[in-house]
Amino acid sequence: MMSSPAKAAKLALEDGTVYTGTSLGAEGETTGEVVFNTSMTGYQEILTDPSYRGQLVTMTYPEMGNYGINSIDLENRGTSLAGFIIRNESRMHSNYRSEGSLSDYLNSQGVVGIAGIDTRALVRRIRSEGAMRGVLSTTDLDDASLVAKAKASPGLVGRDLVQEVMPTQLEKWTNELDDWTIREIREAAKDASIGDDSRPHVVCMDFGMKWNIPRHLRSRGNRVTIVPGNASADDILKMDPDGVFLSNGPGDPEPLTYAHKAIGELLGQVPVFGICLGHQLLSVACGAKTFKLKFGHRGANQPVLDLETGKVEITSQNHGFAVDDQGLPDCLEVTHRNLNDDTIAGVRHKDTGAFAVQYHPEAAAGPHDSHYLFSRFQEQLNEKCGVTA
């Protein structure tokens, strides 16, 4: 029996460039900022990372879907990205954990995708011209119409995308990491207690958090409570936390004034650790400014220099904005730098010890070079709680 021909799909950029390919996943039309990710694997974690809200994600590696989709590697309840762009989907998915194909998962989540285009040419254009607005469609295949829609679509600057992905109520988190990673962490931390009410209590401000973050915190023996990203400092302090974690999330940190206020009021009262958007929000709360990168940092192979130790970490990153060196407040010390473009990749508050990094130490997916940052936070939590690890 012959299979039916693949349905056509088109991707149009605001500069007038149009790419024609085949439909992948759900049919329909979607707009967003066209960006690229250089990871070879980890597409499931990328699909379920809320930080990609409002973005059409292009994978630079040409073959996707070869190990399928499973229910274990999800980083949130569903997908958040605007659309998915690849060169080719593997016709076979083979892995002992695989529960379905990439295209079937995209279809079940209502994600519009495109395959069969020259992703190398697309990425070179984004790299040269910068990330730009685009429209991906299987229903409207008229080039002029699509380009007009791309030009009329909203960008990321000035939009509060966190409101679209953060939880609506608090949650007690109990899930841990897989057994192998737990053994690795506890051996390094010499800490084997889990669930004891005397253990440190971490409140996570969820701006679009990946689930591997609370898994890391929980697997170190902490009690973990997740609150919406718009929670006030008063509400958080009423929970009697021993530390506050500022999560990753999508988009521009500047319009999140509710978060700036809460973080500013928390500084000095409890230990604070932030990553990705949380890094930017901590910096802005201290008086720093941010700016939009030309095409962002997205991938699992970004080199970062630890200025204190001189060591280089290979990190997983996903952000389109960065903290500006110009006008950095005196209270903040730069601790890490991205070796690709020398942008700020980590800061520490000189007076309170609060710290944050622009990358993802939880490594889902990605290298494990930066797990030590969770241990550093744990030391602060234990000291605050009076626990001897």
Curated annotation (Swiss-Prot):
Molecular function terms from GO: ATP binding; carbamoyl-phosphate synthase (glutamine-hydrolyzing) activity; glutaminase activity
SUPFAM superfamilies registered for this protein in UniProt: Carbamoyl phosphate synthetase, small subunit N-terminal domain (SSF52021), Class I glutamine amidotransferase-like (SSF52317)
Binding-site residues for L-glutamine, renumbered to this chain: 51, 249, 251, 277, 280, 318, 320-321
Top-level taxon of origin: Bacteria
Catalytic activity: hydrogencarbonate + L-glutamine + 2 ATP + H2O = carbamoyl phosphate + L-glutamate + 2 ADP + phosphate + 2 H(+)
SMART domains per UniProt: CPSase_sm_chain
Name used for this protein in its record: Carbamoyl phosphate synthase small chain
Gene that encodes it: carA
